[in-house]
């Protein structure tokens, strides 16, 4: 039994190692398809006009690509198991071989399937975040991600967990919360939104855009969310199918236009020198980080060029 447990433990570790080697990161997958679809060549207005289509196409293309890669990944792991005792299958029919293989490696097969399921769930959220960030960049909306600024800027750990982006940035959030917006990306809604509303009230932030693809938000939840200054943002197709009569649900195109108008309020703002230097250092770091992703690098170079220190 101990030997079997060790074999299973070793196989689980092999899954982890091979997954990190064979599967691209969620961002890399999305960015590759972003360029493949030619969005990196589009102008700013294209993103304002077609954000919903861009998001749908990027999601679909990334899913198609991912399934191909995951299939090859799973194939390699099953081959790894088969190679351990391939001699035992030589004189068997295909049916006999499959029966023996599945019987002998039930735990390993389950471990791989479970790992694939968990990976899909995790990747779906991260890919969605990457898509939204690229759309914001394409529309030339200034923002920073929670990952680039850390959670310390927010009043509570609960709020920090929910916020993915701050428009236009952490400096502005500290200087004047009423002229900033928080963006939370969730493929589906599972949070306890009453608590989120309480957190929002304490921050004095103007609003939170809850970006989602959830097609089954109840009327009760929509009313609760609206009460707490949280605006649902989704694609035009999801609105047409599910939320035509919901005033608190807007399209990605609507959100981009609202954010653009909000950013105008920061033109000619008298920033403290320390905040400007912090912004400059952040953008320089991000330019280096995304040196191999020209579209992203160009976005941050543009943001940096707009800073007058």
Positions of predicted regions on the chain:
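Active-site metal-binding core of divalent-cation-utilizing nuclease and nuclease-like domains
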Residues: 145-173
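Short, well-structured alpha-helical interface segments that form or flank functional binding sites
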Residues: 123, 127-131, 160, 188-195, ...
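Nuclease-adjacent, charged terminal/linker segments that flank catalytic cores
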Residues: 1-97, 306-309
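Short, composition-biased local secondary-structure segments
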Residues: 91-109, 163-166, 187-199
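Acidic-basic catalytic patches of nuclease active cores, encompassing PD-(D/E)XK
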Residues: 106-153
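Short acidic loop-to-helix transition motifs that present clustered carboxylates
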Residues: 84, 91, 150-152, 190, ...
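Domain-level recognition of nuclease-like catalytic cores that cleave nucleotide substrates
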Residues: 215-308
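Catalytic cores of nucleic-acid endonucleases
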Residues: 176-236
